[in-house]
Curated annotation (Swiss-Prot):
GO terms for cellular component: membrane. Heme binds at C440. GO terms for molecular function: heme binding; iron ion binding; monooxygenase activity; oxidoreductase activity, acting on paired donors, with incorporation or reduction of molecular oxygen. InterPro entries: Cyt_P450, Cyt_P450_CS, Cyt_P450_E_grp-I, Cyt_P450_sf. It comes from Arabidopsis thaliana (Mouse-ear cress). The lineage of its organism: Eukaryota, Viridiplantae, Streptophyta, Embryophyta, Tracheophyta. Its cofactor is heme. It is a single-pass membrane protein. This is Cytochrome P450 71A14. It is found in: Membrane. Its main location: membrane. It is an enzyme of class 1 (oxidoreductase). The chain crosses the membrane at residues 3-23.
Length: 497
């Protein structure tokens, strides 16, 4: 009797599997899906991702086209690798592709994703985005932080001056990370924390976050294999960084609550005042505030630092471009000027071209933050289902020879001097900050710091790397994670100009 029951169960399971396979084939025959590489049962195409997914995805796109459908486990993932497809997706279907996938690793780190970058599209996201723009990121606010930028850059320049007088090597990567974190913490948290013991660990934890979020954990896509992530320590690391940041942000909040005689209110004060009031039916909780602050801190620190690091790397690797930039800046400055102001930078066309070229070759987020379709769409004649995750490979788009010419892989700032193509979301061949509703709202905040920092570093000093390594493997080696900086610190020798 038991054997009969077991046989019936097995037969039922087999019949269901065959029925499912038949239905899948029938569905596939009725819809027009984008080109797809063959996928392995259970894992799909996850095995085709390298440590640098933007590179492996571009290689796949060369074979399967600029619009291809992958499967990470059973999750359909649309990969966009051309400006033409990106335009149709983010211009025509912007609202339908404004959502974010709900990733478990994000929920563990960011309090269920109740911050701005990873929050689902909806009223809560609209309200917190508005709060961030009005109180931190709009043009008037960014201009009001000019004195903070000047003070922190001047302090950094003193350290460079000391290294140049001693002829000692300088870890420029560490210096730039300190600069960006100090500026961001002063304008968002009210003071800087870089001199506290906990900050060294804080910087390590920041790097861990980008690696975790950009790492495509197996358990996100194949729940039955979530144990692999546990063995790799993914869950433990996520809980560790969440606690570390939560503890620091609790300290920041308590400092603000204890302060009774503050002459001006900062971003944290504004958020704390919102805790007691609803905005259009949206209630911001104490835990939300912690991770919203963290959101702003990470966005203002990591990506800006990575951009400055890549700029200095490319300029040192291309001395002819460095000289051209120095000539432009020094023509504006005199020996009596120790600080190049933001007003001075406004007229420096070659400097802006250098920044744009580095943004093109080294976008801080090579793969834009993943999106998710909220409705079925038709894209380039293909049927794309709701719930499909969307990856936009900005790195591949910005190195496309069809758009940028045969020298697309080369560092050539001159290509931007007479070009109207900009990075603010309307030119889809150049989208380092994204486009549409989900475009990064902190572009002005980042550019204000990047341009004036670069002008001062290049004006007062000449630069050379610690060792001239052969080839690009060392000079341009990339870190792993959502945002990509140098794999190795940029060790340099500055000398007075």
């Amino acid at each position: 009797m038991e054997m009969i029951i077991i046989s019936l169960c097995l037969a039922t399971i087999l019949a269901l599997l065959l029925l499912k396979q038949f239905l899948n084939r029938t569905y596939t025959a009725k819809v027009n899906l984008p080109p797809s590489p063959w996928r392995v049962p259970v894992i799909g195409n996850l095995h085709q991702l390298s440590l640098h997914p933007h590179r492996s995805l571009r290689s796949l796109s060369h074979r399967y086209g600029p619009l291809m459908l992958l499967h990470f486990g059973r999750v359909p993932v649309l990969v966009v690798s051309s400006s033409d497809v990106a335009h149709d997706l983010m211009k025509t279907h912007d609202l339908k592709v404004a959502n974010r996938p709900q990733l478990k690793v994000v929920e563990k780190i960011f309090n269920g994703g109740r911050e701005m970058v990873f929050s689902p599209y909806g009223e809560y996201w609209r309200q917190i985005k508005s709060v961030c723009i009005v109180n931190l990121l709009n043009k008037k606010k960014v201009q009001s932080f000019e004195k903070v930028r000047e003070e922190e850059i001047s302090e950094m320049m003193e350290r460079v001056e000391k290294a140049s007088s001693d002829s000692s090597p300088l870890n420029l990567s560490e210096l730039l990370l300190t600069l960006t974190s100090d500026v961001t913490s002063r304008v968002s948290l009210g003071r800087k924390y870089s001199k506290e013991e906990s900050m060294s660990d804080f910087k390590i934890q920041m790097r861990k976050i980008t690696e975790l979020v950009g790492g495509f954990p197996v358990g996100e896509y194949i729940p039955c294999l979530a144990w692999i992530d546990k063995l790799r320590g993914v869950d433990e690391k996520a809980e560790e960084v969440s606690k570390a940041f939560g503890d620091l942000m609790e300290k920041v909040l308590q400092e603000h609550l204890d302060a009774t005689d503050k002459p001006t209110l900062d971003f944290v004060d504004v958020l704390l005042s919102l805790e007691r009031h609803e905005r259009n039916g949206v209630q911001i909780r104490r835990s939300d505030i912690k991770f919203l602050i963290l959101d702003m801190f990470l966005a203002g620190t990591e990506t800006t630092y990575a951009l400055l690091e890549w700029i200095m790397t490319e300029l040192i690797r291309h001395p002819e471009c460095m000289k051209k930039l120095q000539d432009e800046i020094r023509a504006k400055a005199t020996k009596l000027i120790l600080y190049i102001s933001e007003e001075d930078v406004e007229d420096m066309k070659y400097l802006k071209a250098v920044v744009k070229e580095v943004l093109r070759l080294h976008p801080p987020l090579p793969l834009l933050v993943p999106r998710e379709l909220s409705e079925d769409i038709k894209l380039k004649g293909y049927d794309i289902a709701a719930g499909t995750q969307v990856i936009i490979n900005a790195w591949a788009i910005q190195r496309d020879t069809m758009t940028w010419g045969i020298d697309a892989e080369e560092f050539r700032p001159e290509r931007h001097l007479d070009s109207l193509v900009d990075f603010r979301g309307t030119n889809f061949e150049f989208i380092p900050f994204g486009s549409g509703r989900r475009i990064c709202p902190g572009i002005g905040f980042a550019m204000a710091l990047v341009e004036v920092t670069l002008a001062n570093l290049v004006n007062r000093f000449n630069w050379r790397m610690e060792v001239q390594h052969s080839g690009d493997e060392y000079d341009l080696a990339e870190s792993t994670g959502l945002d990509v900086c140098r794999k190795f610190p940029l060790i340099v020798f500055p000398s007075p100009a």
